[in-house]
Amino acid sequence: MIKIYDTMTRSLQDFIPLNEGKVNMYVCGPTVYNYIHIGNARSVVAFDTIRRYFEYCGYQVNYISNFTDVDDKIIKGAAEAGMDTKSFSDKFISAFMEDVAALGVKPATKNPRVIDYMDEIIDFVKVLVDKEFAYEANGDVYFRVSKSHHYAKLANKTLEDLEIGASGRVDGEGEIKENPLDFALWKSAKSGEVSWESPWGKGRPGWHIECSVMATEILGDTIDIHGGGADLEFPHHTNEIAQSEAKTGKTFANYWMHNGFVNVDNEKMSKSLGNFITVHDMLKSVDGQVIRFFLATQQYRKPVNFTEKAVHDAEVNLKYLKNTFNLPIQENANDEELEQFVKAFQEAMDDDFNTANGITVIFEMAKWINSGHYTSKVKETLAELLEIFGIVFQEEVLDADIESLIEQRQEARANRDFATADRIRDELAKQGIKLLDTKDGVRWTRD
């Protein structure tokens, strides 16, 4: 049985879906005002891997990941670029789709956009106002946190701790809010900003209400899994829970999952430190599969430390797996140990999707394969396990000229013409083909 570390309970829980054989997942997507950075990619890759493992286990997964296309940063960025907010968002949505495709990420079942759910957002806020979970103040609408009895549970803090932190922040809302923790459901329009008509005047939604509406509209009042980066625990996911459960009276999500951060040379990634790395830029020099494999080297909840050496190591290890995958099949080989590797892999992944341990099993399996255990069944299984990580190797086919040289070398060795055999080997090495003579014949790998 799959066990999930649930952030809400701070414990491993057996995964029991709402509907047998089906998984409904909502994962918070990007705010589309720039190219995604490597930290954003960690979340995308982590939850794509989780989705793929569910599917490997036979589940039907309804995977929803949104685009936040109404936001202060988008308004500011569009104005600076001399574009309308939709065209500006469209640009970075297209860039996002290209970047994650290069990382081998499967398309979501649906990628909802905020602008397509404005009527539903307004209706949601109206219900909260009618139930007195929200109040209007100067054209803004705020959620009344004092009525949410378990508000701080996901953040694992006391309400008093959060209030102290919120009261220390100075903003223009402080004088009109009943409580420093109250958060905006609807913001009144400022001059020149994109806005929509509402019962409270022209305005736009707050960030947190957007995800609650899209998640419940598509997946229903209660969903199986809600995921995102660890930075979203508070306030974003905390506020999602408060407003969603206030409206429906039901548990919003049964499992809360949060991935760890990506550090750069053991420092937090930030523009101020000059270590801000976008996937768009990284893909110019590093293959997408290498980036993805690097991100999978740690279990999703743990931080990943980005260094040039770590990425290089991922490239070397991936090349080893690729060369293993392209070894010649030996149908008469002994593959009785295969099921032991599969069982060990599944045990690793069932334990809260421990990709680090899962990859360790794959490398143990690769070592076993290289010792002469590569049947068609083994190759098919290796491909299935690698695909969970979004790694798909294409069958390598040698050019006819190279195949001819390998055959000529074999003939030279048979005739004990080792000078010719060595010359051909060196010539092939210059073309990136490395030969290995074994008791079962010659094997080749591509450097």
From Swiss-Prot:
Query: Where does it primarily localize?
Result: cytoplasm
Compartmental location: Cytoplasm
Report the enzyme's class at the first EC level: ligase
'KMSKS' region (motif): residue ranges: 268-272
Asked if the keyword Aminoacyl-tRNA synthetase belongs to this entry, the reply reads yes
EC number of this enzyme? 6.1.1.16
Q: Which UniProt keywords apply?
A: Aminoacyl-tRNA synthetase, ATP-binding, Cytoplasm, Ligase, Metal-binding, Nucleotide-binding, Protein biosynthesis, Zinc
Can you name one GO molecular function term for this protein? zinc ion binding
Q: How is the cofactor bound?
A: Binds 1 zinc ion per subunit.
List residues binding Zn(2+). Answer: 28, 211, 236, 240
Classification via InterPro entries: Cys-tRNA-ligase (IPR015803), Cys-tRNA-synt_Ia_DALR (IPR015273), Cys-tRNA/MSH_ligase (IPR024909), CysS_C (IPR056411), Rossmann-like_a/b/a_fold (IPR014729), tRNA-synt_1_cat_dom (IPR032678), tRNAsynth_Ia_anticodon-bd (IPR009080)
Q: What family is reported?
A: Belongs to the class-I aminoacyl-tRNA synthetase family.
Q: What is this protein called?
A: Cysteine--tRNA ligase
